[in-house]
Amino acid sequence: MYQRNILVEQADPEVWAAIQAENLRQEQHIELIASENYASPAVMAAQGSQLTNKYAEGYPGKRYYGGCENVDVVEQLAIDRVKKLFGADAANVQPNSGSQANQAVLLAFLKPGDTILGMSLAEGGHLTHGMPLNMSGKWFNIVSYGLNEKEEIDYDALEAKAREHKPKLIIAGASAYSLRIDFERFAKIAKEVGAIFWVDIAHYAGLVVAGEYPNPVPFADVVTSTTHKSLRGPRGGIILMKAEHEKAINSAIFPGLQGGPLEHVIAAKAVAFKEALTPEFKAYQQQVAKNAKVFAETLIERGLRIISGRTESHVMLVDLRAKGITGKAAEAALGQAHITINKNSIPNDPEKPMVTSGIRVGTPAITTRGFKEEETRITANLLADVLENPNDEANLAAVREKVHALTSRFPVYR
């Protein structure tokens, strides 16, 4: 029997120390990784609840275990809320991650060897959309589409490839593409060749909810997303689908890929979805988009090239070649200045994937902590200051001091 009054700090000082160090890092550092955000205390409290103790294989009202009456309520709330958020016919809130949600789509609609048309990872796609080392690339025949000379999705080439290869499934969505995607045109192409049309909005979901990015639900057969990133919920996944695909998708998740769902995480998803239904969340997403525009404009003023020349979302790719620094080196230097970003390949990148010629920058996290246009402009200039002299310790120290002055004015949890 454990002692009920013993908390983490007494039970495991080593883990507690790491948690506290991470808490300090999140408070002091400026977070610009586009896929990261700060979940609310309410979301984290739900995830830390007693629901973690409950096994609940199956779906609400159709469980293989007894005692599921309370988790049924929670899961149904999550389903109903996410359907309302996106205007979807049906939803599955059980995927443990965005990648598992994506795997479920493949399991529901395809057989090994079927052809998929997806965005090239090298030009902004995601590894679950056909990267050779990923399950999607190992099990299926992958045909990739990419960008044109303007670094925009080449819809004409995409259409030609669809007609030539007759894919069973076409994927829209990206992990490093800053522009709006024409989901309606994708849908027309998919319909012409008889393909299932799947959209992955893991990055854009929060913006979609607020009307700041196109909603693919009216056009797609199935839509997947993570629940963290711009949705600002717990780490996990969701699947939205047309009514006729609900049985296939649900069977692909359980028993196809997963057993008992993580009901404590589903509770946190439900809380996050309720938050996302508020006017405050819409205003937050509007500010995310405004901040991204300011960030990109400021970097351009400082002599940096933005891939595609602009952003129409929360994210941007920055080409560092003119500065003579790799993405890997930039990530390290910015980290020393307490600005967190990730290295990222750019289209036709001459560097290896673990080195890269670019960085990816996003505004969801800084907007959550309260940054508006003024603070965003300051942050973009601080980032540019580091890139001007990445090996100058005095420069890094000066930027770090300015970062701390800024973050102390906008605490996350304190």
Curated annotation (Swiss-Prot):
InterPro entries found in the cross-reference section: PyrdxlP-dep_Trfase (IPR015424), PyrdxlP-dep_Trfase_major (IPR015421), PyrdxlP-dep_Trfase_small (IPR015422), Ser_HO-MeTrfase (IPR001085), Ser_HO-MeTrfase-like (IPR049943), Ser_HO-MeTrfase_PLP_BS (IPR019798), SHMT-like_dom (IPR039429)
Keyword list, A-Z: Amino-acid biosynthesis, Cytoplasm, One-carbon metabolism, Pyridoxal phosphate, Transferase
Positions of modified residues (N6-(pyridoxal phosphate)lysine): K229
Pathway assignment: One-carbon metabolism; tetrahydrofolate interconversion; Amino-acid biosynthesis; glycine biosynthesis; glycine from L-serine: step 1/1
Chief location: cytoplasm
Database matches in PROSITE patterns: SHMT
Positions of the record's site feature: Plays an important role in substrate specificity: H228
Annotated EC: 2.1.2.1
GO cellular component, one term: cytosol
BP GO annotations: glycine biosynthetic process from serine; tetrahydrofolate interconversion
Gene3D superfamilies to which the protein is assigned, alphabetical: Aspartate Aminotransferase, domain 1, Type I PLP-dependent aspartate aminotransferase-like (Major domain)
Co-factor requirement: pyridoxal 5'-phosphate
Catalytic activity: (6R)-5,10-methylene-5,6,7,8-tetrahydrofolate + glycine + H2O = (6S)-5,6,7,8-tetrahydrofolate + L-serine
Enzymatic class: transferase
Subunit structure: Homodimer.
Chain's role: Catalyzes the reversible interconversion of serine and glycine with tetrahydrofolate (THF) serving as the one-carbon carrier. This reaction serves as the major source of one-carbon groups required for the biosynthesis of purines, thymidylate, methionine, and other important biomolecules. Also exhibits THF-independent aldolase activity toward beta-hydroxyamino acids, producing glycine and aldehydes, via a retro-aldol mechanism.
Family: Belongs to the SHMT family.
UniProt protein name: Serine hydroxymethyltransferase
Originating species: Paracidovorax citrulli (strain AAC00-1)
Protein's gene: glyA
